[in-house]
Amino acid sequence: MLQNQEISKKEKYNIDKLQKRLRRNVGEAIADFNMIEEGDRIMVCLSGGKDSYTMLEILRNLQKSAPISFSLVAVNLDQKQPGFPEHILPAYLEQLGVEYKIVEENTYGIVKEKIPEGKTTCSLCSRLRRGILYRTATELGATKIALGHHRDDILQTLFLNMFYGGKMKGMPPKLMSDDGKHIVIRPLAYCREKDIERFSQAKGFPIIPCNLCGSQPNLQRQVIADMLRDWDKRYPGRIETMFSAMQNVVPSHLSDVNLFDFKGITHGSEVVDGGDLAFDREEIPLQPAGWQPEEEDARLDELRLNVVEVK
């Protein structure tokens, strides 16, 4: 009995610690990119997956103690896929007392009509879904649209574009929508997928399967995801370092003439970003940048939280 109580205490401690880390990650992303401002009405796109559930939970948590006032409205798009459990999200959101809207649009029927059997339907489905969400945001008077993409999604997109698209382009934490009418934010931009997975399991979110449409998975994205997971296991810190690199771009040491004026360099030009080291190799840190062992991460989390609580 006593042993079970000790295990329960430890589990609760670990869940609390995990939630605090996710909360800190989301808070830092919001601050770094000015994602949420006074009076914002945030449309939280809820798919029924682990990422969007976690995003809603953390935003609700932050809302209680934030120095600014903002409101949340959860939106789910019921695409009329066979077997979609349409009762789950309304019941969950009503239990939470969260304002919500279920948008019913038969995009499934449109996609099935346009795309041959066995082909990936994600591209067309995504375009249709995007248009409906933009329209819904306008109808609800939302000032921001929050999507549940996390750090791993952002890195996957970067490598997909590098390997298959020939460009260095990731997934922005905050940007104007392609129709020029909405601001899209990704509050989970600094969050690790493995943290979200653990948090989702601990909270027991009522997960809705994402493959109800029967579409074939995006094999290219799956290959990239498997590669990153393998690197994370074999080379601790590599994922963190790559994400840090996305925040520390040096245009003068790349080859994009639109980002840096290489043609304008002449004798007498100033030295930029340390200049060219010719044959000398740049010193590389022994430890990956932006990474710290799990134990140290936990210790620093505790220290930061204590400081915040004292304040």
Swiss-Prot record:
Q: Which cofactor does it need?
A: Mg(2+); [4Fe-4S] cluster
Q: Which Enzyme Commission number(s) are on file for it?
A: 2.8.1.-
Q: Which enzyme type, at the first EC level? A: transferase
The Gene Ontology biological process terms listed for this entry are: tRNA thio-modification
Motif span (PP-loop motif)?
47-52
- Kindly tell me the pathway this chain contributes to: tRNA modification
Q: Which UniProt keywords apply?
A: 4Fe-4S, ATP-binding, Cytoplasm, Iron, Iron-sulfur, Magnesium, Metal-binding, Nucleotide-binding, RNA-binding, Transferase, tRNA processing, tRNA-binding
Q: Which Gene3D superfamilies match?
A: HUPs
Q: Where in the cell is it found?
A: Cytoplasm
UniProt record similarity statement: Belongs to the TtcA family.
The name under which this protein is listed is: tRNA-cytidine(32) 2-sulfurtransferase
One family from Pfam that matches here is ATP_bind_3
Q: How does it assemble?
A: Homodimer.
Looking at the keywords, is Nucleus present? no
One of the record's GO cellular component terms: cytoplasm
Anything else known: The thiolation reaction likely consists of two steps: a first activation step by ATP to form an adenylated intermediate of the target base of tRNA, and a second nucleophilic substitution step of the sulfur (S) atom supplied by the hydrosulfide attached to the Fe-S cluster.
Species name: Klebsiella pneumoniae (strain 342)
Function of this protein?
Catalyzes the ATP-dependent 2-thiolation of cytidine in position 32 of tRNA, to form 2-thiocytidine (s(2)C32). The sulfur atoms are provided by the cysteine/cysteine desulfurase (IscS) system.
Lineage in the entry?
A: Bacteria, Pseudomonadati, Pseudomonadota, Gammaproteobacteria, Enterobacterales
Cofactor notes: Binds 1 [4Fe-4S] cluster per subunit. The cluster is chelated by three Cys residues, the fourth Fe has a free coordination site that may bind a sulfur atom transferred from the persulfide of IscS.
- Sites binding [4Fe-4S] cluster sit at C122, C125, C213
Q: Name one GO molecular function term.
A: magnesium ion binding
Catalytic activity, per the record? cytidine(32) in tRNA + S-sulfanyl-L-cysteinyl-[cysteine desulfurase] + AH2 + ATP = 2-thiocytidine(32) in tRNA + L-cysteinyl-[cysteine desulfurase] + A + AMP + diphosphate + H(+)
